[in-house]
């Protein structure tokens, strides 16, 4: 099974669903609202702004949670405020909600009533746009604003890595970059991220209109070292829980040693270098922010549910649905011990970018 067929958040609205456990990304969405607001307003300073009848906005990797509704609200209010200021007629707004085909679009669409009830006097529409953002999604010159939050760090495939001499698994006992991983593991992850992010930018450039904007919020790190606790904590906890299941005979060790997550947590420098290398965009704004996890991840039970909501589909595909309850119970136990020793992660790091399509890359 390809990565794109098993990458989706837990569906529905049960206690382990993404809808009920997306508190951290909701917090990030709230903190980054000013960037989205400013990007939407900047569309009305370009050469084509007077002719807007319809504003096309895409949210890539929207999932099924309420975060996309925060983005929609921000764009609507920003557009309305700017049109009021300029005494212009407000355009209709068409939202394209994108994610992979396994996404729970039904739950997403049910939640749209929040937007419809809140903005009854605004002409706005929404439609699903299933597909991978690692390829083209929209026609040329069709999008005015593209937004993606906590999507771009997901890779199109698991990085290819080989061990020295080929005698043992290259990342034995781990599922992501760690202190014990050989340098080849980091190099493989970085190489795959570079390939995917460059492809992402190349696909978005022709889709955007002249002066079009793109806002990206990416799970990131502050340190140049990819093995710091801020980068690896989530995956270390999960790897330890899986290793425990192996020791109990519930999971085959080979399944652990052959599994690595298709996910990379970049630094701001790595992201900026790739934007500059690809060359289609001007960086209007870039920052690295920290969001406190108090009340979201620091409670062991909440932390385990959060982790389960966005990892269970791919973890169950590799290790089997029958061990999931015991596995995430062990995650909770590990978080309890880490809390006692004050070893748990207390804040999350995000890289925030606002990009503008360059004049020299107009389609």
From Swiss-Prot:
Residues where Mg(2+) binds: 171, 259-260
Positions bound to S-adenosyl-L-homocysteine: 18, 62, 67, 99-100, 132-133
Cofactor note: Binds 1 Mg(2+) ion per subunit.
Activity sensitivity to pH: Optimum pH is 9.0-9.5.
InterPro entries in UniProt: MeTrfase_7, MeTrfase_capping, SAM-dependent_MTases_sf
Family indicated by similarity: Belongs to the methyltransferase superfamily. Type-7 methyltransferase family.
Listed name of the protein: 7-methylxanthine methyltransferase 1
Organism: Theobroma cacao (Cacao)
Gene that encodes the chain: BTS1
């Amino acid at each position: 099974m390809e990565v794109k067929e098993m990458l989706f958040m837990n569906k529905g609205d049960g206690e382990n669903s993404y809808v009920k456990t997306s508190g951290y990304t909701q917090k990030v969405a709230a903190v980054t609202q000013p960037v989205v607001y400013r990007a939407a307003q900047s569309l009305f300073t370009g050469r084509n702004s007077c002719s807007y009848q319809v504003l096309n906005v895409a949210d890539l990797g929207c999932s099924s949670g309420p975060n996309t509704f925060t983005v929609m609200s921000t764009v609507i209010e920003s557009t309305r405020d700017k049109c009021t200021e300029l005494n212009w007629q407000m355009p209709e707004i068409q939202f394209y909600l994108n994610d992979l085909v396994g996404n729970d679009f039904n739950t997403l669409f049910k939640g749209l009533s929040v937007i419809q009830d809140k903005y009854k006097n605004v002409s706005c529409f929404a439609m699903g746009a299933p597909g991978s953002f690692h390829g083209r999604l929209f026609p040329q010159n069709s999008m005015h604003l593209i937004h993606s939050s906590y999507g771009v760090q997901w890779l199109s495939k698991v990085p290819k890595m080989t061990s020295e001499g080929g005698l043992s698994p290259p990342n034995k006992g781990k599922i992501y970059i760690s202190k014990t991983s050989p340098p080849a593991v980091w190099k493989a992850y970085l190489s795959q991220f570079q390939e995917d992010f460059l492809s992402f930018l190349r696909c978005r450039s022709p889709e955007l209109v002249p002066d079009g904007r793109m806002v990206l919020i990416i799970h990131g790190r502050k340190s140049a070292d990819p093995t710091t606790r801020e980068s690896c904590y989530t995956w270390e906890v999960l790897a330890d829980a899986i290793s425990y299941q192996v020791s109990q005979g519930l999971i085959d060790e080979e399944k652990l040693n052959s599994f690595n997550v298709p996910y990379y947590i970049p630094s701001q420098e790595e992201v900026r270098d790739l934007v500059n290398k690809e060359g289609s965009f001007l960086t209007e704004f870039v920052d690295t922010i920290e969001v406190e996890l108090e009340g979201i991840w620091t409670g062991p039970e909440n932390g385990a549910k959060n982790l389960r909501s966005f990892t269970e589909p791919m973890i169950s595909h590799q290790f089997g649905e029958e061990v999931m309850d015991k596995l995430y119970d062990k995650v909770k136990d590990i978080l309890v011990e880490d809390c006692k020793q004050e070893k748990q992660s207390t804040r999350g790091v995000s890289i925030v970018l606002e990009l503008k399509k360059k004049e020299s890359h107009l389609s």
